[in-house]
Amino acid sequence: MEKFDRKPQIADIPPKMVKKYGSGKMLIPSPRDIDEIIRSVGKGRLITQEQIREKLAEKYGVNITCPMTTGIFISKIIALMAEEKIRKGEGDVTPYWRVVGKNGVLNPKFPGGVEMQARRLEEEGHKIIYDRKPRVKDYQKYLVK
């Protein structure tokens, strides 16, 4: 829980990231902020990690949100906490499986890998295209705004 409640931080965009993102300010988000956004994604809907980062950057008035920490917090804190609640039979679970990558690609770093994410998404009515990188068919139609 300590890591979940860490405070967001704002820093200069590191020199090694300036070429890709430009100079300015970068948010190192809190898992709680990310969790709130994921919880707002209703059944049958999807959100990309990029959308999460954009929403947080706008909320905090910065240029970008750190892509690395966002991904780590989703797969290593939020998803694991959700799975623990599911295992214990508790309600109020963050639907982390609704977070997809670029082009609707499933996340192999989630608990249970792409297989579990695919199963949960299929249970919510999504069709999965199983190829080299499994992804949600027509994912753009289901993205939150």
Regions found by a protein language model. Give the residues of each.
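Nucleic acid-binding interface residues in structured DNA/RNA-binding domains
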Residues: 1-145
